[in-house]
Amino acid sequence: MNKEELKPMDLGGILDKTFRITFSNMKKYIKVFLMYFGVIFGITLLILAIVIGFFIAMGFSFESFSEPEILTPFLLTIIPLSIIAIIIIIFIAIIFTGMIYDIFIKSFIGEEWDFKSSFKYVKSKFWTIFLAGILCFFIIIGGYLMCCIGILPMIALISLVLPVIIYEKENATGSISRSFKLVSYSFWKVLGSVILFIIIVQTLSIVFQIGFQFLPFMLQSLDSGKNIQMIIFISIFTIVTYILYLAYSILASALYGAFYVLIFFNQKIKHENFGVEFLADSITVDQPLDDKTK
C-alpha cells in the first residue's frame, strides 16, 4: 500500500480520488457489469420468447386470452418463471454490488483483484448483504416517516454498510452499527459529502434524461411529423442520447461504490489510525537504508 493512500483526505480529495479510482478500475467493473447484464438480458429474452410463443399459438389474437385452455397454461408458465426470474435478479444484483465494492477496496489497499475469487467471496456474503439491505430499507423508511428530510441523514449513516461487510466481515446487524459508528465520528462532514456527491451525480443524470426524453418530444411537437429529415434527426438523436445515458448510468453506479469505499477508509484513517501497522513495517524496512546513508 502506498503511504500517500494513508493520508486523510478532505472532500475535494475524496471527489478527485473517486473519479481516478473509478476510471483506473473501469475494465474490471465492465467485466462484472457484463456478467450482470448478461444474466438480466438472458432472462428477459427467455420470458419474451415464451410470451411470443403463446401469441403465435393464439394467432396473435388478444381475445384468445379469455379462453381457459390458453390463459391457464400461460399463467401456470409465466408466474413461476417470473418468480424464479425475480429471485435470480435479486441474487445477481447483490453479487454485482458486492463485487463492485470489492474491486475498489482491493484497489485502495493495493491488493490484486480476481473475478473468480471475488465472486466466491461475495457469494459467501450473500445473506449478510441481503439481510443488511432489508434492515437498511426499514431504517430509511423510518427516516422518511419521522421527516422527509430524515432520509438523507439515514442514508449517510448506513452508507458504509457494504464496505464494512466486504472488508471487516461483519454480519448484517453488526455492519449497520459499525457504519453508524464510523459515520458518527464526523457525521456532518460525511452527511455534507454524501449530499454533495448525490447532487453532482443526479444533476448529470437529469441532463441526460432531459436530452433523452424531453428534447426529442419537443422537436417532434414543433415539426408535427411532416419533415422526414427531422424525423431521422430525432431518431438518431434519441438513440445517441439513450446510449450516453445508459453509459452514464453504468458509470454512476461505479462512482457511488468508489465514493463510499473512500469515505469508509478515510474515516478509519482519520479516527482509528488505520494503516499504522503498515507504516511501522515500512519504516522498519527502510531503516537499514537510512543507516547506510549516514
Question: Where do the model's predicted regions map?
Answer:
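Hydrophobic transmembrane alpha-helix segments characteristic of membrane transport
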Residues: I95-S124
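Interfacial aromatic "cap" segments that immediately flank transmembrane helices
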Residues: L6-P8, G12-G42, F115-G142, A156-V207
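Long, highly hydrophobic alpha-helical transmembrane signal-anchor segments
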Residues: V51, F55-L75, D114-F137, I141, ...
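N-terminal start-of-domain structural block
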Residues: E5-I83
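Hydrophobic alpha-helical transmembrane segments in multi-pass membrane proteins
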Residues: V32-F55, T77-T97, F130-I155, S193-Q220, ...
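Membrane-helix interface segments
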Residues: F74-L75, I79, E111, F126, ...
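Juxtamembrane transition segments at transmembrane-helix termini in multipass membrane proteins
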Residues: N2-E5, G13, K17, M58-F65, ...
